[in-house]
Amino acid sequence: MENEPDTICILVDADACPVKAEIYRVAERHNLPVVIVANSFIAIPREAQRVERVVVSGNLDAADDWIAEHSRPGAVVVTADIPLASRALEKGASVIAPNGRIHTQSTIGNTLAARNLMDSLRSAGEVTGGPAPFAPKDRSAFLSALDLAIVRLKRAGFHAS
């Protein structure tokens, strides 16, 4: 991965990411490097350009730790993991969930609190459901959010390497 401070890169929490194909397409269109980080081997299509695979140890948070450590201004982090989103934002990265939700410094506190509340309710047996199934509208929202994040970074002076 290019680690020049003024370049754009995409870091993906890939183990359960449903939008990897979309990330590859957008990255190719913008000529951006992508780093797929996972706890196990994940296949990368041959046609995917500038994609690096990082397989971390089986430790539960190893992928999150790697992504948080490599997050920086100019990085776009794709994750559904709220604590990881918070850590990446602290490092100055842009963060997008696979459903297209854009996390920011001003929204992550409430999102993290809601996540912790739901975890507590689930632990107490009060809530048994989970998030809604991933839908085509989520894929579309993600594509829009990723394009928007890249455009904002370019306007802020970051560039493709």
Swiss-Prot record:
One Pfam family matching this protein: DUF188
Matching CDD domains: PIN_YqxD-like
Domain of life the protein comes from: Bacteria
Family as reported in the entry's similarity comment: Belongs to the UPF0178 family.
HAMAP family from the UniProt entry: UPF0178 (MF_00489)
Protein name per its UniProtKB record: UPF0178 protein BSUIS_A1819
Species of the source: Brucella suis (strain ATCC 23445 / NCTC 10510)
